[in-house]
């Protein structure tokens, strides 16, 4: 069934434009409140947000919807996405909401929903919400005496800081480690530096002064150049780059080299397998993860299960098949021993634990495999279904033949933007580049002709 509001990670779009309007946000609150409200009992929602200016507007609209449906609301303020999932369980809430567009620019925003178990909602529930939003909302309103209330929660970030710190083994501290943290002017700007400092690290923080419009602006995990320079400038042992809602992380080693999610998963998988902590006989990643990771794991008799792009699909596969490590190349790392969703801070702490335990520099710890040449390009589309076009399909089939058994080709529409993502990888770099560029050219020409 076609989805009108929900993408791969909740509802997302430009703030104050469809579907990210106060009206839609209020209807989401009403629909979700009705679905998760416990009849005859007090029910509650927890609502967090990142640092975007439009978060105030959407927060108030969601509160109106939830309270109209008879739910009480706990307002968490600016806080990481994984903290909302954790506090949803800790505060015995019936639903959790994070207002964020993750790594997108400030003018975008989104709504992510978590069930009472802290996991993102299923496709079926999201479709139910969509159907309710499109219909008459009157039947979902609470009676006069059952309208909900809202209150701010004090000390919520400190609960999360303590939770994150407890994931570092008690016999390990970060004493002697100089760490630069890029907070992306986002939701992790208070919690990440505090947690690292309390664990003993010398912390240098950058991009920790959010003003509502500078979130992800030339900073964070999608723009690590500033962090690379700072690590070199202060001679740090490691740099940690979060994104706007702190659910993803990339590292920078002491030489200023970026370490992506594939390498981080390799470190954790190898370490946890050696200590008999790894479950499922391997890890879960998406179709975008590098072939080098798959080969690295296979050499250690570990498997790589692949899913569609989106950490929700990674988590679903982990739960269904008994894995406890999964993630994405982009830096969403899911460690189900600790969390129900990607957690940038906790993932970084596990890597630092390995480095401290082995007494090795980050560059030695995190260079687990040589990535296979991989190229990802995006082409903007003007509507329609370009992947069903005859010329585009023919170009894709031809590309697969050229790559043969020595590479992979992944072509998919973005779940959050009007883009087609084209990724190829293989041992022959020149062939990979030619394959991607040829497909991009065909999609561009056919999309322009259709417009």
Swiss-Prot record:
Its EC number is 5.4.2.10. The keyword Magnesium applies. The active site is at residue 102. It catalyses: alpha-D-glucosamine 1-phosphate = D-glucosamine 6-phosphate. GO terms for biological process: carbohydrate metabolic process; peptidoglycan biosynthetic process; UDP-N-acetylglucosamine biosynthetic process. Transmembrane segments: none annotated. SUPFAM superfamilies: Phosphoglucomutase, C-terminal domain, Phosphoglucomutase, first 3 domains. Gene3D superfamilies: Alpha-D-Glucose-1,6-Bisphosphate, subunit A, domain 3, Alpha-D-phosphohexomutase, C-terminal domain. Keywords: Isomerase, Magnesium, Metal-binding, Phosphoprotein. One of its GO terms (cellular component) is cytosol. Its cofactor is Mg(2+). Mg(2+) binds at residues 102, 243, 245, 247. It comes from the Bacteria. The lineage of its organism: Bacteria, Pseudomonadati, Pseudomonadota, Alphaproteobacteria, Hyphomicrobiales. Activated by phosphorylation. The modification Phosphoserine is found at residue 102. Belongs to the phosphohexose mutase family. The keyword Isomerase applies. This is Phosphoglucosamine mutase. InterPro entries: A-D-PHexomutase_a/b/a-I, A-D-PHexomutase_a/b/a-I/II/III, A-D-PHexomutase_a/b/a-II, A-D-PHexomutase_a/b/a-III, A-D-PHexomutase_C, A-D-PHexomutase_C_sf, A-D-PHexomutase_CS, Alpha-D-phosphohexomutase_SF. Catalyzes the conversion of glucosamine-6-phosphate to glucosamine-1-phosphate. One of its GO terms (molecular function) is phosphoglucosamine mutase activity. It is an enzyme of class 5 (isomerase). Binds 1 Mg(2+) ion per subunit.
């Amino acid at each position: 069934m076609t989805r009108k509001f929900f993408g791969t990670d909740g509802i997302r779009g430009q703030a104050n434009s469809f579907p990210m309007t106060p009206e839609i946000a209020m209807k989401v609150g009403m629909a979700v409140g009705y679905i998760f409200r416990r009849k005859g009992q007090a029910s509650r929602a927890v609502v967090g947000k990142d640092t975007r200016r439009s978060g105030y507007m959407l927060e108030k609209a969601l509160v109106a919807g939830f309270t109209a449906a008879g739910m009480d609301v706990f307002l968490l303020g600016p806080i990481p996405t994984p903290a909302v999932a954790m506090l949803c369980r800790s505060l015995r809430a019936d639903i959790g909401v994070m207002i964020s567009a993750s790594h997108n620019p400030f003018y975008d925003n989104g709504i992510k929903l978590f069930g009472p178990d802290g996991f993102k909602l299923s496709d079926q529930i999201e479709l139910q919400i969509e159907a309710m939003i499109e219909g008459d909302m009157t039947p979902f309103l609470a009676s006069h005496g059952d309208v909900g209330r809202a209150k701010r929660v004090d000390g919520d970030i400190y609960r999360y800081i303590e939770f994150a710190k407890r994931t570092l083994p008690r016999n390990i501290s970060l004493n002697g480690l100089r760490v630069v943290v890029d907070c992306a002017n986002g939701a992790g700007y208070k919690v990440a530096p505090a947690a690292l400092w309390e664990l003993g690290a010398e912390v240098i923080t950058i991009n920790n002064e959010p003003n509502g419009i500078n979130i992800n602006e030339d900073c964070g995990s999608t723009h690590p150049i500033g962090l690379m320079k700072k690590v070199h400038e202060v001679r740090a042992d490691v740099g940690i780059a979060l994104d706007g809602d702190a659910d993803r992380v990339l590292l920078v080693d002491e030489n200023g080299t970026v370490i992506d999610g594939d390498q981080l998963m390799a470190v954790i998988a190898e370490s946890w397998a050696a200590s008999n902590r790894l479950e499922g006989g391997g890890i879960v990643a998406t179709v975008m993860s590098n072939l080098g990771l798959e080969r690295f794991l296979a050499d250690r008799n570990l498997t790589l299960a692949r899913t569609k792009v989106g950490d929700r699909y990674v988590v679903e596969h982990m739960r269904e098949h008994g894995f406890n490590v999964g993630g994405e190349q982009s830096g969403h790392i899911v460690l189900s021993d600790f969390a129900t969703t990607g957690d940038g801070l906790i993932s970084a702490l596990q890597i630092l634990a390995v480095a401290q335990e082995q007494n090795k520099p980050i560059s030695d710890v995190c260079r687990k495999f040589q990535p296979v040449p991989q190229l990802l390009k995006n082409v903007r589309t003007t509507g329609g279904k370009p992947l069903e076009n005859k010329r585009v399909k023919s170009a894709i089939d031809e590309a697969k033949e050229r790559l043969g058994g020595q590479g992979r080709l992944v072509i998919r529409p973005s779940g959050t933007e009007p883009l087609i993502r084209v990724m190829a990888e293989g041992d022959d770099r020149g062939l990979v580049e030619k394959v991607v560029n040829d497909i991009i050219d065909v999609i561009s020409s056919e999309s322009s002709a259709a417009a």
